[in-house]
Swiss-Prot record:
The lineage of its organism: Bacteria, Bacillati, Cyanobacteriota, Cyanophyceae, Nostocales. It comes from the Bacteria. Binds 1 [4Fe-4S] cluster per heterodimer. The cluster is bound at the heterodimer interface by residues from both subunits. It comes from Nostoc sp. (strain PCC 7120 / SAG 25.82 / UTEX 2576). [4Fe-4S] cluster binds at residue 36. Signal peptide: none annotated. This is Light-independent protochlorophyllide reductase subunit B.
Length: 508
């Protein structure tokens, strides 16, 4: 166990709660001490949900430690069942309350005797998995529970839908642009003449889960959530799974061609080539833009990418393959799925980084001095400290990345949004320099610290004054070169003289 003040993927119970609260009329009960219950605040504040978060904390306090939890947990489940009338109550411990090693399965069985709705214990090992793995496991568990229940009652529908149809699996609360992506995927499916059989878990009722086997195929747009469920449905009912992420012009076309292949194999007769052609050439602006003079200005510029597997891999491919940008390194914090990530991006970048340590990522960014960063909220902070622009492309994210306006990342409209994000993330031409010449709003002081805490150098007043005279678009590089020169020569204070000496050394 390690103390962390920043985590890319949260603890396991956050993943379980994200899935449970995405469903309609499902209530979650968290068996946890106060302090583990920040999910309610996070969901209502960040994703701007209108409804109250359906999560109740069954608090582990000194009374519970003295007497045991059974009475309190069972009371909370039956009380919420009577008050809220949910279809399902999901009980989850947290990594903290798991230390008590209580028989929660027994508590659930006790509560089920009195509760009118279903009660389920989230089957997750809180020490072994993170938020993303736990979410995937919980979704699979809920789907399996209701399909088995329908099978026992003889209520499982037979056969497929009359027209080609799809289950979109993995849209959840607190996901990165998930609602916009869902709208765009529905629009894409409508264009292709495919009905949407179900979207899970976001907005779905647990009573609809028995209809999942009726779809012709399952689409899993995000690798982090939904693969276990899709694999289960494929194993049980033979429903094909498509896990190609339709992000960027090339991958969207590949995904559509795979859909064509899958539904034609089941008796349909469709050809989507004309649709792909029209969208690529006339509807999506990305293909046209990538050939324009604006985009050619970006050719060879250096960028770094970091995020979850889905978004980091897709962005790396788009930057390198579609826009000609040099990706110095690409990284992910999904260590459990590192092999897939390496396989996807190794030919599109110089180096692959797999880590959960934000300090290591910050240092890697400072080392390569890219023109732009594409990452999470943490990389945005790093970019601000290093004066390098950053486009946010993956969770974890802050409230400004839950936009109210329509901003999908998937499908053809998604390609436009991503192109805008990439282009606007690079500093344009002489922008900084012109602001300084004409006395614009750019009056910020020079940042003199590295990313890793505890810099051993300090700048004198005359040294800073001299550094401020250097144009903004090269100032960061000059500062770093000067600090390297000072370290090599053993200077502790960097004065104007040291700056001049460093300039001469570099010039020589």
């Amino acid at each position: 166990m390690k103390l962390a003040y920043w985590m890319y993927a949260g603890p396991a119970h956050i993943g379980t709660l994200r899935v449970a609260t995405s469903f309609k009329n499902v209530h979650a009960i968290m068996h946890a001490p106060l302090g583990d219950d920040y999910f309610n605040v996070m969901r209502s504040m960040l994703s701007r949900e209108r409804d109250f978060t359906p999560v109740t904390t069954s608090v582990v306090d000194r009374h519970v430690l003295a007497r045991g939890s059974q009475e309190k947990v069972v009371d909370n489940i039956t009380r919420k069942d009577a008050e809220e009338r949910p279809d399902l109550i999901v009980l989850t411990p947290t990594c903290t309350s798991s230390i008590l090693q209580e028989d929660l399965e027994n508590f659930v069985e006790r509560a089920q005797l009195e509760a009118k709705g279903d009660v389920l214990l989230a089957d997750v090992n809180h020490y072994r998995v993170n938020e993303l793995q736990a979410g995937d496991r919980t979704l699979h568990q809920i789907v399996q529970y209701y399909i088995e229940k329908a099978r026992k009652k003889g209520e499982l529908p037979e056969g497929k839908t009359a027209k080609p149809s799809v289950n979109i699996i993995g849209i959840s609360t607190l996901g990165f642009h998930n609602n916009h992506d869902c709208t765009e995927l529905k629009r894409l499916m409508a264009d292709l003449g495919i009905e949407v059989n179900a979207v899970i878990p976001e907005g779905a009722s647990v009573h609809e889960l028995k209809n999942l086997p009726r779809a012709w195929f399952n689409l899993v747009p995000y690798r982090e959530l939904g693969l276990m469920t899709a694999n289960y449905l494929e194993k049980e009912f033979g429903t094909p799974c498509i896990d190609i992420v339709p992000m960027g012009v090339v991958e969207t076309a590949r995904c559509i061609r795979k859909i064509q292949e899958v539904i034609n194999a089941q008796g349909a007769d469709v050809n989507y080539e004309d649709y792909i052609n029209e969208q690529t050439l006339y509807v999506s602006q990305a293909a046209w833009f990538s050939r324009s003079i604006d985009c050619q200005n970006l050719t060879g510029k250096k960028a770094v990418v970091f995020g979850d597997n889905t978004h980091a891999a897709a962005l790396t491919k788009i930057l390198s393959r579609e826009m000609g940008i040099h990706v110095v390194w690409a990284g992910t914090y999904c260590k459990y799925d590192a092999d897939w990530f390496r396989e996807q991006v190794s030919e599109y970048c110089d180096e692959v980084l797999i880590t959960e340590d934000h300090g290591e990522i910050g240092d890697a960014i400072a080392r390569v001095e890219p023109s732009a960063i594409f990452g999470t909220q943490m990389e945005r902070h790093v970019g601000k400290r290093l004066d390098i622009p950053c486009g946010v492309i993956a969770a974890p994210i802050h409230v400004q990345n839950f936009p109210i306006g329509y901003k999908p990342f998937l499908g053809y409209e998604g390609t436009n949004q991503i192109t805008d994000l990439i282009y606007n993330s690079f500093t344009l031409g002489m922008e900084d320099h012109l602001l300084e010449i004409f006395g614009g709003h750019d009056t910020k002081e020079v940042i003199t610290k590295g990313i890793s805490a505890g810099s051993d150098l300090s700048w004198t007043k005359d040294g800073l004054a001299e550094l401020n005279k250097i144009p903004g678009f090269v100032r960061g590089k000059v500062k770093r070169n000067t600090e390297k020169f000072a370290r090599d020569r053993g200077f502790k204070d960097i004065s104007a003289e040291v700056l001049y000496a460093a300039k001469e050394a570099v010039g020589a």
